[in-house]
Amino acid sequence: MDATLIALGALALSGALATVAGCAEDLESDVGSQSNPNSQVQLAPQMGNIHRYFNKAISGEPVSYGLYVAVAGTVAYAIMQMGLNPILALILGAGVAAFVHGAYAISAYLGRIVGQSKNFGQPVYWDVVMSHLGPIVGHGFIAVFCMVLMAYLANTILGNPFPLPLIALIFGITVGAIGSSTGDVHYGAEREYQKYPFGGGVPVANHGDIDIKAEYGLRNGMDSSYFCSRLGGVLTGLCFGLIVFLDGWRGVLGDILKGGQGGSVITASIISIVIGLIIVAILAIINRKVEVFARNKYGPYTK
């Protein structure tokens, strides 16, 4: 089969995996109140809001997911060097990363909550730990497995020269940054502040004054994940999927347009860079058009 068709197929699969990974990563961070919402949940007891959120963030998502995916990639790489099946190795690597993720989540939650118990009266809810740990580890396993499989495809089929653990680390940092900047805003600036008028942002005076009541009963991280699965998680997945697909597509297109095997690598690289700049310019124009349309349609926020 033609190598270009194989590369395009691997690229399409990588884009689909990236979409699933981005969505799962954002929903996992919503269950655990990591990144954007983290500081608001941390401040809530100091503002008199005793809550039932799971708060597991010691670091930002780029650092933590860089760790998880790098662990999975390193374990999978070591197992593959022993001669085991690559798919089995990737599954085992993601499984080890899931255990690391679970230990990290529990220690972070208990450390943060216990630190606030004495001075601010925030109790440790053990049922919150047990009910939230499964979705956190489960969503994390899905995200990590998809990304380590993407790293394997990039290394074996798409011709990436870097070793599997390093590619996995880069993918983990990337998805963490996207989830933090794209999806978590839906939770940290909207879901946690539904009692305030929409569109006003989060003024400093309101920091920590989060919603602690749900539609029925007290709110927790599971409610937030359900809410964000309709928009924040989807947007994170689409963003990561488009980045992976478009970046790989411009590389494949550069190889095609260079003139086959007779073209030079430098020519292919220049073509890929030009295509990338064109894509960035088009996306910037679309972003500006959407922003102007939204401001003209809904007007500035007043009170």
UniProtKB/Swiss-Prot annotation:
Name the record gives this protein: Tetrahydromethanopterin S-methyltransferase subunit E
Source organism: Methanocaldococcus jannaschii (strain ATCC 43067 / DSM 2661 / JAL-1 / JCM 10045 / NBRC 100440) (Methanococcus jannaschii)
UniProt keyword annotations, A-Z: Cell membrane, Membrane, Methanogenesis, Methyltransferase, One-carbon metabolism, Transferase, Translocase, Transmembrane, Transmembrane helix
EC nos: 7.2.1.4
Function, as annotated: Part of a complex that catalyzes the formation of methyl-coenzyme M and tetrahydromethanopterin from coenzyme M and methyl-tetrahydromethanopterin. This is an energy-conserving, sodium-ion translocating step.
Subunit structure: The complex is composed of 8 subunits; MtrA, MtrB, MtrC, MtrD, MtrE, MtrF, MtrG and MtrH.
One GO cellular component term: cytoplasm
Disulfide bond sites: none
GO biological process, one term: methanogenesis, from carbon dioxide
Pathway participation: One-carbon metabolism; methanogenesis from CO(2); methyl-coenzyme M from 5,10-methylene-5,6,7,8-tetrahydromethanopterin: step 2/2
Predominant cellular place of this UniProt entry's protein: membrane
One Pfam family recorded for the sequence: MtrE
TM stretches of this protein: 3-23, 63-83, 86-106, 133-153, 157-177, 226-246, 266-286
Cell location: Cell membrane
Catalytic activity: 5-methyl-5,6,7,8-tetrahydromethanopterin + coenzyme M + 2 Na(+)(in) = 5,6,7,8-tetrahydromethanopterin + methyl-coenzyme M + 2 Na(+)(out)
GO molecular function per UniProt: tetrahydromethanopterin S-methyltransferase activity
Domain of life: Archaea
Membrane topology: Multi-pass membrane protein
Family: Belongs to the MtrE family.
